[in-house]
Every structure is written in C-alpha cells, then in structure tokens.
From Swiss-Prot:
A biological process from GO: translation
One GO cellular component term: mitochondrion
Assembly and binders: Component of the mitochondrial ribosome large subunit (39S) which comprises a 16S rRNA and about 50 distinct proteins.
Organismal lineage: Eukaryota, Metazoa, Ecdysozoa, Arthropoda, Hexapoda
Name of the molecule in the record: Large ribosomal subunit protein uL22m
MF annotations from Gene Ontology: structural constituent of ribosome
Subcellular location: Mitochondrion
Length: 233
C-alpha cells in the first residue's frame, strides 16, 4: 500500500508544471521556517534556559533584577582612624545571582568554605563533586581579583572567606508528563551566592571554640548558682 501511494505521489509531481512546483515548495518552506521559530519560542516559554547563554529569559525576569544591597557595602566610606588605632582590614563583597541550582544544595558548599583562606578554599573546591562548586569557585576568584584591583589589597593570597551564604532566587513552576494522561509539577529553582573576603589570616576558630568537659561543667555550675528563687527575700 505504501509503495502504491509513493508511486502516485511521484506521478503527480511529474505531471505538475515547473512554475507551480516552485510556488508549492516556496510556500511549504516558509511556514516550516515560521513553525520552527514559533516552536522554538513555545518550547522555551516553558523553561528557564531560554536564549543561547542559558540565563534567565528576559520576558520572565522583568520585575526582578536580583539582589542589589550586597554590593553597596563596597561603596562604604569609613571615618578616618586615629594613629594609635589598629588599621582597619580591607574587605570586598561580591555575589553571583540567579544561579540555576537549588539553594538547599548550595548551602552545603557555602558553609564549607567559611573561615578558610582563599587559597585553601579554592584548593578544596576542586574536590567537591557538586555542580554549585564551580559557581562558588568562580565567584571567589572574581572577588579576589576585585580586591587587588579596586580595594588596595597588596597580596591576593592574604585574604580569607569572612562570610559565605546563599539566598533564594526565583522559582519557576512547570509540568512534567506522566503516564495515562497524568502530569506532575516541576520546580526550576535559582539561588544567589554571596561572599565577603577580608584581608589578613583566618581565625583559628571561625565558629565557637569547642569546650572541654571541665569548662562545660563550670558553665553549668555558674548557671545553677545564678538562678533566681521565686518569692524570696
């Protein structure tokens, strides 16, 4: 049956004049190109990776330009110091917004590099097998370059990660087809990564220093002795 249909179509094309054949092919090619471009727009309208760069689509992101206050700290003008005061450490704040990664997953990487020197953080991030580690590493490298070029830091290795945290970005909701005509909801999450590098060597204990059992006992005993007795003189 397919052979018969193919032969009939070939006979119809042979019988058609050349001018009509050219018009038919031109009219067929124009809608195909139009449909192709329209299909591309329709496909991208359901996803966040529109455009060649894979960034957020401009039509989706009109009313949200990302966080703005974090970079304002770089423009802070501090008052002059007295000669006997300790020199104020230089710092630089940097961020990367709208990263196509879950903020819950990025939190582990951001908390991992807190309190490390820049060289140690970059070295450790090479062994973190997570997608967000690449963005964190690139952001720290950009902040390191900014500190040397714009914030009068003499040695780029004399920096440590003073702050490193994550913010929640935009969440786009989509649909995923399931079997038997059903569908499921999909969330395309984005996050913002913030980092602040400070000049100098990192502290020995970035978080609270762990206490020995004797210190814990003394602290508990002090709390017990400082209790207030209700309705007493």
């Amino acid at each position: 049956m397919h052979t018969v249909i193919r032969q009939m179509s070939q006979l119809r094309l042979q019988a058609m004049p050349s001018s009509a054949l050219l018009k038919a092919t031109a009219s067929a090619s124009a809608p195909s190109a139009l449909d192709h471009s329209g299909a591309a727009v329709n496909h991208h309208s359901l996803h966040t990776a529109a455009g060649s760069g894979g960034a957020l689509c401009a039509s989706w992101n009109k009313h949200n330009n990302g966080p703005r206050k974090w970079l304002v700290y770089n423009k802070t003008v501090h008052p002059p110091q007295q000669p006997d005061e300790e020199p104020r450490k230089a710092y630089v704040c940097h961020m990367r917004s709208n990263i196509k990664y879950s903020p819950d997953k990025m939190w582990y990487i951001a908390a991992f590099v807190r309190g490390m020197s820049v060289d140690e953080a970059l070295k450790q991030l090479n062994f973190v097998l997570k997608k967000g580690a690449t963005d964190v590493k690139e952001t720290i490298l950009e902040a390191q370059e900014m500190a040397v070029q714009r914030h009068n830091v003499e040695y780029k290795s004399n920096l440590w990660v003073a702050e490193s945290f994550v913010g929640k970005g935009r969440v786009f909701k989509g649909m995923r087809r399931h079997a038997r005509g059903r569908f499921g909801q999909v969330e395309y999450k984005h996050c913002h990564y913030f980092v602040r590098l400070e000049e100098g060597q990192p502290p020995e204990h970035y978080y609270q220093e762990p206490q020995t059992p004797e210190q814990q006992y003394e602290h508990w005993l002090e709390q017990m002795r400082s209790r207030k007795v209700i309705n007493s003189l």
